[in-house]
Amino acid sequence: EQAPHFGILYQDTKPLLKGEDGYNYLYRINCGGDDFTDSFGQLWMQDNTNYSRSWAASFNELNPYLASQRTTNDPIRGSRDWKLFQYFRFGRHQLEYNFPVADGMYRIEFYFTEPWHGTGGSASADCEGLRIFDVAVNDSVVLDDLDIWAESGHDGACKKVVYAIVKGGLLKIHFPEVKAGQAL
């Protein structure tokens, strides 16, 4: 049974996660979460140390996966697939993902939400500038000074698409400049 007016939470959903026609998706990672099948039937693989590494890798007593993982139970505006957006990773400039791929041009889709700033705030809360970071692919910045809150507010789904050329068989995603903490 659902709470009264629960359906209002789905009013402004968009098909953000639907795979783009004409593309073969090699990796879908649920950053900070377990395997997840979205409303389009697409599998998002568990985030683990097969592809990612964080600051915690420098400490033998810490699990490098769990050390930079968090979750929220808040509903996510703009998507029916809340669970995918409710898990996230952080790790400043030491968080990175490495994917073996054939050399060539790749379309990379990033999905973000602001999980903390604005929690419990009124509609007039302004959290712009409290989380700013760069996203790089193979050492080239593709998203400069990304401010998730400025893009979609608190608990709003945000999608960014970039293109990158891979040489050497490895697609590396990292965060070379973190001015105020990232959340993926």
Which positions does each model-derived feature cover?
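Compositionally biased, intrinsically disordered or flexible polar/acidic segments
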Residues: E1-L184
